[in-house]
Amino acid sequence: GLMKYINASGDYDILNNGAMEMVIECAKFYRSLLIRKADSSLYEIHDVVGPDEYHERVNNNAYTNRMAKFVFDTVLELSDKYPLDNKLKEMLQDSSKNILIKKPNENGVIEQFDGYFKLEDVSVETVRSRLINPKEYWGGAYGVASNTQVIKQADIVAMLSMFKNDYTKDIMETNLKYYEPRTEHGSSLSA
């Protein structure tokens, strides 16, 4: 939202009134989540929940990792107008360059999080039929959707719409066709 406001208004003064401090703190927070496995040169983010709240405590949620990169890049872009400490700048450059950003597989589909494609691939209706109570929560450790590819909201579709210049139309269409039938379209309000 900050970058949309600045790009629309040209009001860079907002950076001196707390906005730059806010986005720097967001970048530091995301940086604090990064881990690097011994056998990898890439940073990963583990144990998160993306917009799809049916799958909790996942690793490398594509949406979360891409948003972290966006925050790193935003701080670096704004550093032209708002000077950064060299150590922080180098840390954010390293984070942006080396964070794991999921790529499309051979079918053009981006995996929502590590292990998503290994989950049971069933329809939303099949999962709905497993409910004991119609008001039962689908997610969490014991939810009926937790071990399936059925999702509450399509993280990948949201990510692609936010960063559409990074992907081809074909990749966007392929992912929409893959994820839409697996999306339950539950309320974006938690639980």
Regions found by a protein language model. Give the residues of each.
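Structured mid-domain segments that build the active-site/substrate or prosthetic-cofactor binding neighborhood
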Residues: 23, 28-33, 152, 172-176
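The feature captures the catalytic groove of carbohydrate-active enzymes
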Residues: 1-17, 28-97
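Short, glycine/acidic-rich beta->alpha junctions
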Residues: 15, 22-25, 190
